């Protein structure tokens, strides 16, 4: 096995174990044993468990962050929100271990930590869409930061629940999220 292949093997094993047991519940010994190598091999590639975990988390953040570009591909607010909602749920469906690592010991509303920072970044992108939407409804666009966090939090928290429930189908969860958010937004009172 080449050095690059070994590194990827250790990343794959670490990702799975961190998702199952968390950072504290995973040991270098277990990672090395499952890879069929000695502990020094793990240290050689990553410097330790912290280094391996950091690379795993960075890759998941990068993977999820790259999906937020859909926010700017659709021409109108509702299609943008629909696309972003479906993308997040697809990420969860296709990368359950990675999402578990990101949300473990995290709160969707907290802006500290990797997951919270990622959600804050996404909410920042949603602010521009939300400001335009609020303006079109006669609302103060300065409320966009609050509304964007409401929207992102609603999707993120539902995504955490759906990660374990897996019912109803992804498309149905997305449709219901969009229905709740959009119909609620479409009825905003300009005076509130």
Predicted regions and their residues:
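N-terminal intrinsically disordered/low-complexity leader segments
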Residues: 1-5, 141, 189-192
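Short, structured helix-loop boundary elements
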Residues: 7-8, 28, 50, 54, ...
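Helix-turn-helix
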Residues: 9, 13, 17-51, 55
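Short coil/turn segments at alpha/beta junctions that flank glycine-rich nucleotide-binding fingerprints
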Residues: 20-24, 95, 137
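Amphipathic alpha-helical segments used for helix-helix packing
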Residues: 91-113, 127-131, 157-164
């Amino acid at each position: 096995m080449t050095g690059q292949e070994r590194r990827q093997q250790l990343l794959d094993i670490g990702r799975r174990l961190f998702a199952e047991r968390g950072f504290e519940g995973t040991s270098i010994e277990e990672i090395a044993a499952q890879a069929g190598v000695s502990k020094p091999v793990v240290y050689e590639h990553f410097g330790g468990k912290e280094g391996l975990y950091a690379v795993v988390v960075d890759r998941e953040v990068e993977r999820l962050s790259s999906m937020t570009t859909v926010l700017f591909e659709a021409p109108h607010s509702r299609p943008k929100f629909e696309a972003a909602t479906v993308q997040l749920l697809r990420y969860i469906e296709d990368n359950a271990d990675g999402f578990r690592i990101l949300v473990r010991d995290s709160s969707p509303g907290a802006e500290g930590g990797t997951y919270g920072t990622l959600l804050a970044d996404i909410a920042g992108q949603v602010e521009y869409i939300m400001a335009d939407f609020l303006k079109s409804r006669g609302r103060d666009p300065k409320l966009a930061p609050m509304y964007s966090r409401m929207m992102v939090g609603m999707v993120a928290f539902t995504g955490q629940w759906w990660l374990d429930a897996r019912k109803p189908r992804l498309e149905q969860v997305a449709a219901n999220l969009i229905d709740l958010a959009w119909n609620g937004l479409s009825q905003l009172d300009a005076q509130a």
